[in-house]
């Protein structure tokens, strides 16, 4: 029976006889003495087999190879001074193997090296196909255990400190598409009808508040059939919370304490409370996005009022057509950013184009304080306009000013992308810095140009600000997002709990009373039976752990992720199904493979 994990052994264990299980990380023969690095999920320890001191284990030790599974019993001893290894926690001790038992070998060539000593970069498709090997590697084992520690801290705080209870909500539910596409499943028992996998437990957790379970949480699986990016998966995990009888301030305060507890427990970091706050309008004005990375400055400057009478037609027309003109000031930008990079074909021009911009204007501040730019801009700005630009941006000799002009959405998107790209290039981002902030006072709705209608910016169950009930179309939402180093890691709101307000919101987003009743009648009826004021939040667990682990993709903190084509390379899912199954489900496929 196992007595210890490999990575647990320290000097205090010297003299003990231990039994370990694990994989041979690597084997070395030094002058007839066999050294094995034995690995399990906790780490590595060195095992020694000497023909003189441990003759019973020597022959088998000599035959072992990488990734063989073994049981080893032996005595913990002090390593000689010359072989101490300060790079690993067990580097002061080693095990003299009295007994080795081979539990299983390796019958095929490894597709990649698993050993912690190997620094080879392995293709991601191989890592995902042979995930069981990838998860043995130190980096992945640490990430999965870190994920467990985060979840454990969440549960401990919510249950032991705040009195929340964990409630499971259904995975098979009805389709209420408002946003991303649902994953749908045919019902065999009810032919012609369909279940949907939940995009979130939103409606069920609100029903739980109606039920009197006033502090709910769940580690919830969610499903969205959407285009995938580096930080998205078709199935993902949330910490989902809902609470009754709490104001927006009280919900935010509770969540700051929760997040602070997680950081202290998992990372050993004390976070200053309360977290800073930005309104949505401030975030968009200063950073061009609603999830700004505030580890570095590079704030945008709005000069629309200065440019409305500009002689430069591009700037003047942008303001006249209801758009904006903004500047991204870059200290020392003259030295590092050439005109070639800003003009068509350059990397910064390309970055701007991908955000929808048609061009990229600039002004350079020379060492003598004069400005340098293309003639069309320089000749069409008055001296007063030039001085106002320099004053507002705080530009000094060496500054580069990049302009965005046009509709607000495109300008903000363009300058946000450029801000992030330049911060990385200039080394302005401290990877060890932790900046958390709340973004509050979101608009209730945004305009969907494709469908020519308003849609909820968060979701249609978000409560409007009580001061804005007279005009829902321009109302602020009682919504709040938690931003961690430029990533939204949590989003929540106070909820609508009165039927008439909910019906007004449905009408505003274009749902007829009949559609609202068909999709959400059960919720509207629940509001007739004494619904308490309530609100909540959901945290993206995958994204939060990714940031804790210092990874760049959530695929590296999920045990069995999908690819960006929504495929599982390990099991080769999704796959076809037997025709008999389709008949039982009364389903036929119209898909015709391309020849």
UniProtKB/Swiss-Prot annotation:
It catalyses: tRNA(Asx) + L-aspartate + ATP = L-aspartyl-tRNA(Asx) + AMP + diphosphate. ATP binds at residues 224-226, 233, 488, 540-543. Gene3D superfamilies: Bira Bifunctional Protein, Domain 2, GAD-like domain, Nucleic acid-binding proteins. Keywords: Aminoacyl-tRNA synthetase, ATP-binding, Cytoplasm, Ligase, Nucleotide-binding, Protein biosynthesis. SUPFAM superfamilies: Class II aaRS and biotin synthetases, GAD domain-like, Nucleic acid-binding proteins. It is found in: Cytoplasm. One of its GO terms (cellular component) is cytoplasm. Pfam families: GAD (PF02938), tRNA-synt_2 (PF00152), tRNA_anti-codon (PF01336). L-aspartate binds at residues 178, 224, 458, 495. The record marks 30 as: Important for tRNA non-discrimination. Its EC number is 6.1.1.23. GO terms for biological process: aspartyl-tRNA aminoacylation. GO terms for molecular function: aspartate-tRNA ligase activity; aspartate-tRNA(Asn) ligase activity; ATP binding; nucleic acid binding. Residues 202-205 are annotated as: Aspartate. Belongs to the class-II aminoacyl-tRNA synthetase family. Type 1 subfamily. Aspartyl-tRNA synthetase with relaxed tRNA specificity since it is able to aspartylate not only its cognate tRNA(Asp) but also tRNA(Asn). Reaction proceeds in two steps: L-aspartate is first activated by ATP to form Asp-AMP and then transferred to the acceptor end of tRNA(Asp/Asn). Homodimer. This is Aspartate--tRNA(Asp/Asn) ligase. The lineage of its organism: Bacteria, Bacillati, Cyanobacteriota, Cyanophyceae, Nostocales. The gene is aspS.
């Amino acid at each position: 029976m196992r007595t210890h994990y490999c990575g647990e052994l320290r000097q205090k264990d010297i003299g003990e006889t231990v039994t370990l299980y694990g994989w041979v990380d690597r084997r070395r023969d030094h002058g007839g003495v066999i050294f094995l690095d034995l690995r399990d999920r906790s780490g590595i320890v060195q095992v020694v087999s000497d023909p003189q001191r441990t003759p019973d284990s020597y022959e088998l030790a000599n035959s072992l190879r990488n990734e063989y599974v073994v049981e080893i019993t032996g005595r913990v001893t002090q390593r000689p001074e010359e072989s101490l290894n300060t790079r690993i926690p067990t580097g002061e001790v080693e095990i003299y193997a009295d007994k080795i038992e081979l539990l299983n070998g390796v019958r095929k060539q490894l597709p990649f090296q698993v050993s912690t000593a190997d620094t080879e970069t392995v293709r991601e498709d191989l890592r995902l196909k042979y995930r069981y090997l990838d998860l043995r590697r130190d980096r992945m084992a640490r990430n999965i255990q870190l994920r467990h520690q985060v979840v454990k801290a969440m549960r401990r705080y919510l249950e032991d400190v705040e009195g929340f209870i964990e409630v499971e909500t259904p995975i098979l539910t009805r389709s209420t598409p408002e946003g991303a596409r649902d994953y749908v499943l045919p019902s065999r028992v009810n032919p012609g009808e369909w279940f949907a996998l939940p995009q979130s437990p939103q409606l069920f957790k609100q029903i739980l508040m109606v039920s009197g379970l006033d502090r709910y949480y769940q580690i919830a699986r969610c499903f969205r059939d959407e285009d995938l990016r580096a930080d998205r998966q078709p199935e993902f995990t949330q910490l989902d919370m809902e609470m009754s009888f709490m104001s927006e301030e009280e919900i935010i305060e509770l969540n700051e304490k929760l997040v602070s507890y997680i950081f202290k427990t998992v990372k050993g970091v004390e976070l200053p409370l309360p977290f800073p706050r930005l309104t949505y309008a401030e975030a968009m004005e200063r950073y061009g996005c609603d999830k700004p990375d505030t580890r570095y400055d590079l704030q945008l400057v709005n000069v629309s009022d200065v440019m409305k009478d500009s002689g430069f037609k591009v700037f003047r027309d942008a303001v006249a057509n209801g758009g904006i003109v903004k500047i991204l000031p870059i200290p020392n930008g003259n030295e590092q950013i050439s005109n070639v990079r800003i003009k068509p074909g350059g990397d910064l021009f390309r970055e701007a184009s991908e955000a929808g911009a048609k061009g990229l204007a600039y002004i350079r501040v020379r060492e003598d304080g004069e400005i340098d730019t293309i003639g069309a801009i320089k000749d069409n700005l008055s001296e007063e306009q030039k001085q106002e630009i320099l004053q507002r941006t705080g530009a000094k000799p060496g500054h580069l000013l990049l302009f965005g002009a046009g509709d607000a959405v495109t300008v903000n998107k363009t300058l946000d992308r450029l801000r992030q790209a330049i911060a990385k290039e200039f080394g302005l981002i401290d990877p060890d810095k932790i900046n958390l902030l709340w973004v509050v006072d979101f608009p209730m709705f945004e305009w969907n140009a494709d469908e020519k209608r308003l849609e909820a910016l968060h979701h249609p169950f978000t409560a409007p600000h009580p001061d804005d009930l007279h005009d829902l179309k321009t109302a602020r939402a009682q919504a709040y997002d938690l931003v961690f180093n430029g990533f939204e890691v949590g989003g929540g709101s106070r909820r609508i709990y009165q039927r008439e307000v909910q019906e007004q919101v449905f009408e505003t987003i274009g749902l007829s009373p009949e559609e609202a009743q068909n999709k959400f009648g059960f919720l509207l009826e629940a509001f007739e039976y004494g619904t308490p004021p309530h609100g909540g939040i959901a945290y993206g667990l995958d994204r939060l752990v990714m940031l804790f682990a210092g990874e760049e993709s959530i695929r590296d903190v999920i045990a069995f992720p999908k690819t960006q084509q929504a495929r599982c390379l390990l099991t080769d899912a999704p796959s076809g199904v037997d025709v008999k199954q389709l008949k039982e489900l009364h389903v036929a496929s119209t898909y015709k493979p391309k020849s």
